[in-house]
Swiss-Prot record:
This is Urea transporter 1. The lineage of its organism: Eukaryota, Metazoa, Chordata, Craniata, Vertebrata. InterPro entries: Ammonium/urea_transptr, Urea_transporter. Its main location: membrane. Gene3D superfamilies: Ammonium transporter AmtB like domains (1.10.3430.10). It catalyses: urea(in) = urea(out). Belongs to the urea transporter family. Mediates the transport of urea driven by a concentration gradient across the cell membranes of erythrocytes and the renal inner medullary collecting duct which is critical to the urinary concentrating mechanism. Facilitates water transport in erythrocytes. The record marks 334 as: Important for channel permeability. It comes from Capra hircus (Goat). It is found in: Cell membrane; Basolateral cell membrane. GO terms for molecular function: urea channel activity; urea transmembrane transporter activity.
Length: 384
């Protein structure tokens, strides 16, 4: 998977220099807006605090899909506006409040600047708006959204104290805890903040295989990615894929593969087609596939196959947890992704090609692979 760098030879007259520079100029320019935009973050350090804060919020919005890129954050915000401006507003409010709370609590500044103190609250705001039985533009909802967003840095800090002992990320566990707590406290019959009624399946679904639509299945692939943010609009899902692609093509590939495997898992269990079309089988497996396929494990053929296995396992676990949690009137959220991926990250093996990235070194898959190759090279050369 490694390519040897090629050298550009210049003649004595220097006629080839401008041409060589032209070839390098475009990749260099792309380097400033792809990946984690590290150069931009460094440039912002001596700029006004308000401008830095906007960068942190945008990175927080994109960190839901493991991306720390403000341009990706803008694209994702556009996708949310395409889906529902009210959900976009609640997501932004949640991210802003959570980031401010983290600053007030003096949390690790590098985590704040990378957006790691905002992404859980992004989901909290969006999903609280989606599960509100009052519909769109129920402005009083902004108060509980702000309150629950304040809990996210607290949950994150507490969970990190435990999970850091095993060098594990907190993922979206704070979001799951905050949303489950809110929906449990309010419920469908709350007079102030009623939530959508979640009930278990009580009858055999009517699945007619001849009615299966290939076009709808194709659309469900981007919709599965869109459902990471609670969006069922294929255009929104396509924009999210574009935002991921801007940061990392490898992440985009695994996001799409994970969504596809979720569709396959749903079909294998004869799930209702409308659930598959709505992307409900794809979002957890998409996140799991990204996490194992190069993000928290260095990408090799072995970890790629492990990512596929994790995506399938996550989809089936999601079906199981949906049935169990519906009994108490709660959605499964991203609990399946968190539990399944943490389980796979705890895997121990003597295979050197299955390499779990140190949390402090995690950036994005392409950079993670470079770190892995350099570490492997140092290990081989060490005894010499």
């Amino acid at each position: 998977m490694d390519d040897n760098p090629t050298a550009v030879k210049l003649d004595q007259g220097g006629n080839q220099a401008p041409q060589g520079q032209g070839r390098r100029r475009l990749p260099k320019a792309l380097g400033y807006i792809t990946g984690d935009m590290k150069e931009f973050a460094n440039w912002l350090k001596d700029k006004p605090q308000a401008l830095q804060f906007v960068d942190w919020v945008l990175r927080g919005i994109s960190q839901v899909v493991f991306v720390s890129n403000p341009i990706s954050g803008i694209l994702i915000l556009v996708g949310l506006l395409v889906q529902n401006p009210w959900c976009a507003l609640n997501g932004c409010v949640g991210t802003v409040v959570s980031t401010l709370t983290a600053l007030l609590l003096n949390q690790d500044r590098s985590a704040i600047t990378a957006g790691l103190q905002g992404y859980n609250a992004t989901l909290v705001g969006i999903l609280m708006a989606i599960y509100s039985d009052k519909g769109n533009y129920f402005w009083w909802l902004l108060f509980p959204v702000s309150a629950m967003s304040m809990t996210c840095p607290i949950f994150s800090s507490a969970l990190n104290s435990v999970l850091s002992k095993w060098d594990l990320p907190v993922f979206t566990l704070p979001f799951n805890m905050a949303l489950s707590m809110y929906l449990s406290a309010t419920g469908h019959y709350n007079p102030f903040f009623p939530s959508t009624l979640v009930t278990p399946v009580t009858s055999v679904p009517n699945v007619t295989w001849p009615d299966l639509s290939a076009l709808q299945l194709l659309k469900s692939l981007p919709v599965g990615v869109g459902q990471i943010y609670g969006c069922d609009n294929p255009w929104a899902g396509g924009i999210f894929l574009g935002a991921i692609l801007l940061s990392s093509p490898l992440m985009c590939l695994h996001a799409a593969i994970g969504s596809l495997l979720g569709i396959i898992a749903g079909l294998s269990l004869s799930a209702p087609f409308e659930n598959i079309y709505a992307g409900l089988w794809g979002f957890n497996s998409s996140l799991a596939c990204i996490a194992i396929g190069g993000m928290f494990m260095a990408l090799t053929w072995q970890t790629h196959l492990l990512a596929l296995a994790c995506a399938l396992f996550t989809a089936y676990l999601g079906a199981s947890m949906s049935h169990v949690m519906a009994v108490v009137g709660l959605p499964s959220c991203t609990w399946p992704f968190c539990l399944a991926t943490l389980l796979f990250l705890l895997l121990t093996t003597k295979n050197p090609n299955i390499y779990k990235m140190p949390i402090s070194k995690v950036t994005y898959p392409e950079e993670n692979r470079i770190f892995y190759l350099q570490s492997t090279k140092r290990t081989v050369q060490g005894p010499l």
